[in-house]
Every structure is written in structure tokens, then in C-alpha cells.
């Protein structure tokens, strides 16, 4: 079995995957909403029409991600207020940090914290760093940040405790767009230096 499931209230099922990469490929025609987590998928459904067991039986683990995942190239100005701190903690130069950050390919594992805030895996292990001891009251939209094993881009102005290494003018969240979040789970992201 590749996943286990649990009822999540009367109108949802939580799938837990032994292989977290499979969560991007989970589809269900009976689900009204699919929410991807770090190793789970939440399927919300119409409880008046379906039972938990019906929804679970309709889950398919096809190659859905391969056909829908997008690739994004994000231009970044590497001038974040925590850039030197992250380089120092990583025991590499700022130039080396930028080189490593732009050579990696990241995958959007899941979204959370704020609309359009994608947790990107693929960060060089040397650059894994703790969050700030004291969060900032306001992090500007477009801030490129790292914390723990993840990289992210703040899609809107918000409070935040991640280490800021750069900024982008790319729009990551547009509530008027058909898909408001630019980067969605399963998508890949690469960063390039603004010259």
C-alpha cells in the first residue's frame, strides 16, 4: 500500500503517503478540493453524496504531475538583509552562496503560511539555516528567503521569520488570476541573478 487514509471530519479524507513524491500525482474525481501537504493530501468532498470509503476508492496515483507541473525561472537581486548572515552560517562566501542558490532546481513541495507561499525543496544542505530569533513585523512582497531545508518567496507583504537573501519583481500571487498562486505543488523553480 502506498498510502493510508483517515477521516478528516465528515467531508474530508487525509491521505498519508509512504513515498511523499506520490502526493503530487494523487487525483480524485469525487474531490471538490485537493490540498497537498508535506507528506499528505487532504481531499474535501460533498458528504451528502459520498462516504469516505467512496472517495478513497476513487483515488488514482497516475502521472498527473508530469502533465501539469510548470517550470518557473525567477529573476533575483541578491541583496537581502540576511544574505551575509546565511553565507557566514554556511561557511561560504556570498558569491558562492549565490552560485549554489542559482544552480539548484527547486520543487514546490506544498503551499502554506500565506496564499501563494510555496515551500521549495532542493536547497543546498550547507545553506540550511534556522529562522530568525525574532520575526520581522513586515517582510516585503517578493523577498526570497531560506529557513531550515526550504527556500521560499514571500508572495505578499506579511510578517515573517525566514532569512532574507534577495528579492524578485515576479508576481507570485494574483487573486484575480484563474490560478491565483503562480507556483503550485509539484512545480519546479530555478533562480537567476538579475544583472
Q: Which residues are covered by each model-predicted region?
A:
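Conserved "landmark" site that anchors the functional core of diverse proteins
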Residues: 1-195
Amino acid at each position: 500500500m502506498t498510502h493510508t487514509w483517515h477521516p478528516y471530519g465528515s467531508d474530508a479524507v487525509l491521505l498519508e503517503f509512504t513515498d511523499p513524491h506520490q502526493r503530487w500525482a494523487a487525483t480524485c474525481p469525487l474531490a471538490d478540493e485537493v490540498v497537498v501537504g508535506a507528506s499528505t493530501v487532504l481531499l474535501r468532498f460533498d458528504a451528502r453524496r459520498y462516504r469516505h470509503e467512496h472517495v478513497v476508492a476513487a483515488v488514482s496515483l497516475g502521472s498527473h504531475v508530469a502533465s501539469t507541473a510548470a517550470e518557473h525561472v525567477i529573476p533575483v537581486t541578491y541583496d537581502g538583509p540576511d544574505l551575509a548572515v546565511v553565507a557566514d552560517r554556511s561557511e561560504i562566501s556570498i558569491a558562492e552562496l549565490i552560485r549554489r542558490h542559482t544552480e539548484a532546481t527547486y520543487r514546490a513541495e506544498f503551499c502554506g503560511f500565506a496564499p501563494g507561499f510555496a515551500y521549495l525543496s532542493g536547497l543546498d544542505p550547507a545553506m540550511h539555516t534556522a529562522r530568525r530569533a525574532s520575526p520581522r513585523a513586515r517582510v516585503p512582497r517578493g523577498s526570497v528567503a531560506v529557513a531550515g531545508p526550504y527556500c521560499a518567496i514571500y508572495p505578499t507583504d506579511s510578517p515573517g521569520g525566514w532569512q532574507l537573501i534577495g528579492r524578485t519583481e515576479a508576481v507570485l500571487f494574483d487573486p484575480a488570476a484563474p490560478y491565483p498562486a503562480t507556483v503550485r505543488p509539484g512545480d519546479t523553480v530555478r533562480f537567476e541573478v538579475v544583472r
